[in-house]
From Swiss-Prot:
Keywords from the UniProt entry: Cytoplasm, Phosphoprotein
PTM note: Phosphorylated by CDC28, probably in association with G1 cyclin CLN2.
Assembly notes: Interacts with CLN2.
UniProt feature, compositional bias: Polar residues: 49-61
Its job: Weakly suppresses a RAD53 null mutation when overexpressed.
Region Disordered, annotated ranges: 49-68, 200-229
Molecular functions per Gene Ontology: RNA polymerase II cis-regulatory region sequence-specific DNA binding; transcription coregulator activity
Subcellular location: Cytoplasm
GO biological process: G1/S transition of mitotic cell cycle; nucleobase-containing compound metabolic process
Name of this protein: Protein SRL3
Modified residues (Phosphoserine): 212
GO-annotated cellular components: cytoplasm; nucleus; SBF transcription complex
Length: 246
């Protein structure tokens, strides 16, 4: 009949007292051997286990040769050794002694030929870029070493329009001469030159220079009369133009 190992927490260590175990409560009609086995205290079980270890061939014999009967081997209390627990890791180690290869998805698989071609293309691209950078640096150095072309300075003549020359960016003397000749041909430029070189403006400049304080009043009168005459002339000109336009 199969018997379960007694629960040592429920068994009392004193040999005189007898405690009912779970097996006795479940099936009280057990034989005497099973009752004695279940009611055995824990101290006696430990003594028999020590005697079993001494009787084993690996253990050294006692020096006296006389063994205590309490420590003799008892077949009733022989239990097998502990079973090593099996975990998924140990099972995998037993079933697969060699290391498992890394998992690779089929879409991520790349052929070796493609790898070689990509590497070669990247190397050639890098070499081309390096060559282009070297060429550009050499060209910049050559441009910096070349001296600028000589430019002729424009000599000032009787009249030179600096603003027009800057706007036109006349780098040579011929271009500046052509530009000035084109300005002289235009009617607006001719009218501007006439206004500058008019006799009336020259006379005013001469009169205004070196005037004594005694002649200030007379100078003011003459200036006012001249302004009035000029206003009359301008008014007459405007009236004539308006009549001609009508």
């Amino acid at each position: 009949m199969f018997l379960k190992t007694p629960n040592w927490e429920t068994v009392n260590e004193t040999p005189k007292s007898r405690v009912l175990t779970i097996n006795e409560l479940i099936s009280p009609n057990l034989d005497t051997e099973s009752n004695s086995l279940l009611a055995t205290p824990a101290r006696k079980y430990f003594k028999t286990s020590i005697s079993e270890a001494q009787d084993s061939p690996t253990s050294a014999p006692s020096p006296d040769g006389n063994e205590d009967p309490t420590y003799q081997y008892n077949v009733q209390f022989h239990f097998p050794g502990p079973i090593t627990p099996t975990t998924p890791r140990s099972k995998n180690a037993e079933m697969f002694p060699s290391p498992t290869p890394p998992l690779v998805s089929p879409t991520a698989v790349i052929e070796e030929e493609n790898d070689d071609s990509v590497r070669e293309f990247s190397r050639t691209l890098k070499s081309r870029l390096n060559c282009a950078m070297v060429k550009l640096s050499k060209e910049h150095e050559q441009v910096a070493l070349i001296p600028p072309p000589p430019t002729e300075k424009i000599r000032k003549g009787s009249y030179s329009n600096k603003f027009a020359a800057k706007h036109r960016r006349c780098h040579s003397l011929d271009e500046s001469k052509k530009f000035l000749s084109s300005l002289e041909d235009s009617s607006a430029h001719a009218a501007f030159l006439k206004a500058i070189s008019s006799k009336h403006a020259k006379s005013n400049r001469v009169d205004n220079v070196n005037v004594s304080p005694l002649r200030w009043s007379s100078h003011r009168r003459t200036q006012s009369t001249q302004e009035n005459s000029l206003q009359e002339v301008v008014a007459i000109d405007t009236l004539l133009k308006m009549s001609s336009s009508d």
